């Protein structure tokens, strides 16, 4: 197997070894949540009288020879070595990609008789010239087609493609052999573009695609369920029937791309859900399709953007959507294989997580309305620590007429008329929601610690955060760093007016990653609002970040020079305060995501501008602090800086 699938000699030097097979690249893993590069066909085809079975693996082959190499300090610092990575910075070249098939035959005893590497009958770049990323791939359940989700470079067009195995030919040794192999591919064998999504914002890639098995005699159509955010601006489920319209292609001749080639007409597209709320699709969210009862189970925010619930709807005659989980909590659910049970991991701001199993009971004649009954507990909620006081969720309408949600941790020693120093904890970027009705006392326990020490802590999900629709999240398009601080400051003033315990002359802004970037941006744009900023692992110059993330939200640099400059905090250090002890920067030296270069460059600019700053480096940490001692040190550093200078 190794010799079949490895397209490279596996050299240790990244410069000498630019090719890989079956492995997702850094950007694909980090920015598209795809962590594999190969997909087993679920069925084996039997051929001939010798009882030979053909097994197939679809895999991605990647050539990174034109991708920049960057050097990150190695964890083995005492050896003074660096780790080398291929890292495509925004605007630079991405890897060249293609899809291939590994095909092998086994005898009746399961022994591999022969193996063959296959490639597409025409070069990938010729068949799909606008495709930059293979976001997802897999097989239909009957193994008749491989499928893939293709994205263009601006990430504004997604195509869902079917690839019949017959479209792949053995890897030829020369052009003459390629022509011979191509002759064996029938003219009506082709890729099918069964679905397209386009937007002028960006595509949020997800996993939800459920192709039904084609009924006997209806091979010219494919029915599937797909989640689509682009149609209405909110992610919803659709049942789609595509007609597999066949053309005629001479695969021996070089293929010349035409815009409408391979496109399939949509015979029917029925919305199963709708409204100003979202079906959860990103970050590994699933749907569960019961073909016997014609029901689809999904998770969504139909009741409130602050809670995730499990719902069910008929995909045959959609209409009523039934919620299966208890309101007042946010749930993360999974259905059993035979759809009679589900498990929920749920919590609220005031209730720690518990895990319960529920059985659906009721009439088989009306499966949509089966009611969940408590069946078993796998984990009961632990009791809160005695000094834990949950945050209070609030909402307000901004001057630009947008409803925003936030949460506030009240100082534990709050008294009427007393004003408290305040920490505005921020993330503020896309794909993240901090404010919801789930328990915060584990991941964000330090926010309660701050409240116990007399600080007020405020958290606001402004425009650009997720779970509120594409227009809301898309407020950041081409202007990262230019809208978020306004929402944070408006929320801060709302809390100050509503609760009366915030000392607006003593406000700190603090966050990590995108939150670190916004902490710096807050001190640059609103130095009269924020007395101090504590920025963890900040992006300081967007030109140094990767293609997949940066171009999705900011376009390529040459198309958005103004946006890149306005959003790069290291280019605006002259606006930072001249007073000492107002800026603390924290960064892991081994950060593989937001490279230490960002802090290095920022500090160089600060020194050139004669601006004061404090810097805390974590020599053995990456993008997230993992070592408990480092975590403790960070918390003490944070507290000390707040106590001394806020």
Per-segment meaning from a language model:
Residues 166-168, 232, 240-246, 251-252, ...:
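Alpha/beta-hydrolase-fold serine-hydrolase catalytic core, especially in secreted/extracellular enzymes
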Residues 103, 161-166, 238-241, 314, ...:
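Structural recognition of the beta-propeller blade-terminating site
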Residues 28-29, 86-93, 149-153, 227-230, ...:
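Short consensus segments that form the blades of beta-propeller domains
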Residues 54-62, 66-69, 95-98, 122-138, ...:
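Non-catalytic accessory segments flanking enzyme active sites
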């Amino acid at each position: 197997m190794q010799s079949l699938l490895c397209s490279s000699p596996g050299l240790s030097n990244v410069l000498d070894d630019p090719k890989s097979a079956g492995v997702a690249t850094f950007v694909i893993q980090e920015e598209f949540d795809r962590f594999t590069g190969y997909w087993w066909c679920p069925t084996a085809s039997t051929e001939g009288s010798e009882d030979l079975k053909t097994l197939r693996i679809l895999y991605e082959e990647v050539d990174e020879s034109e991708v920049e190499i960057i050097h990150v300090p190695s964890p083995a610092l005492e050896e003074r070595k660096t780790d080398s990575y291929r890292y495509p910075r925004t605007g630079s070249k991405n890897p060249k990609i293609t899809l291939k098939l590994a095909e092998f035959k086994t005898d009746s005893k399961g022994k591999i008789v022969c193996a063959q590497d296959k490639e597409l009958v025409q070069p990938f770049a010729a068949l799909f010239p606008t495709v930059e990323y293979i976001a997802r791939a897999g097989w239909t359940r009957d193994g008749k087609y491989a499928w893939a989700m293709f994205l263009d470079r601006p990430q504004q067009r997604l195509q869902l493609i079917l690839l019949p195995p017959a479209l792949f030919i053995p890897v030829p040794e020369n052009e003459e052999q390629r022509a011979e192999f191509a002759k064996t591919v029938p003219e009506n064998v082709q890729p099918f573009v069964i679905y397209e999504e386009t937007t002028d914002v960006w595509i949020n890639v997800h996993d939800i695609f459920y192709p039904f098995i084609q009924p006997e005699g209806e091979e010219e159509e494919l029915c599937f369920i797909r989640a689509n955010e682009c149609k209405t601006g909110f992610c919803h489920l659709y049942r789609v029937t595509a007609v597999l319209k066949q053309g005629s292609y001479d695969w021996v001749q070089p293929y010349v791309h035409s815009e409408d080639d391979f496109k399939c007409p949509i015979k029917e597209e029925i919305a199963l859900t709708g409204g100003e709320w979202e079906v959860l699709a990103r970050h590994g969210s699933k749907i569960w399709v019961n073909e016997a009862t014609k029901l689809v189970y999904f998770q969504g925010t139909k009741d409130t953007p602050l809670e995730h619930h499990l719902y069910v709807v008929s995909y045959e005659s959609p209409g009523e959507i039934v919620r299966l989980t208890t309101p007042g909590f946010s749930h993360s659910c999974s259905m059993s294989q035979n759809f009679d049970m589900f498990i929920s991991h749920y919590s609220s701001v005031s209730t720690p997580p518990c895990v319960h199993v529920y059985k659906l009971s009721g009439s088989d004649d009306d499966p949509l309305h089966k009611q969940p009954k408590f069946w078993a507990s796998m984990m009961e909620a632990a009791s809160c620590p005695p000094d834990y006081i949950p945050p209070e969720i609030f909402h307000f309408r901004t001057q630009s007429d947008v409803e925003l949600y936030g949460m506030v941790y009240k100082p534990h020693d709050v008294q009427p008329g007393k004003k408290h120093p305040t920490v505005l904890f921020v993330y503020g970027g896309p794909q993240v929601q901090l404010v919801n009705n789930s328990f915060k006392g584990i991941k964000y326990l330090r926010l309660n610690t701050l409240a116990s020490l007399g600080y007020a802590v405020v958290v606001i999900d402004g425009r650009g955060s997720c779970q509120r629709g594409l227009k809301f999240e898309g407020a950041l398009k081409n202007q990262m760093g230019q809208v978020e601080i306004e929402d944070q400051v408006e929320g801060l003033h709302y809390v100050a007016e509503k609760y009366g315990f915030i000392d607006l002359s003593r406000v700190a802004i603090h966050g990590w990653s995108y939150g670190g970037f916004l902490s710096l941006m807050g001190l640059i744009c609103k130095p009269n609002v924020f007395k101090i900023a504590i920025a963890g692992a900040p992006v300081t110059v967007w030109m140094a970040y990767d293609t997949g993330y940066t171009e999705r939200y900011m376009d390529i640099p040459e198309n958005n020079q103004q946006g890149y400059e306005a959003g790069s905090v290291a280019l605006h250090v002259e606006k930072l305060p001249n007073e000492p002890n107002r800026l603390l920067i924290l960064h892991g030296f081994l950060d593989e995501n937001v490279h230490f270069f960002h802090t290095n460059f920022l500090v160089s600019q600060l020194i050139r501008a004669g601006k004061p700053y404090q810097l805390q480096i974590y020599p053995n940490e990456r993008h997230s602090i993992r070592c408990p001692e480092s975590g403790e040190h960070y918390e003490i550093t944070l507290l000390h800086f707040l106590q001394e200078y806020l």
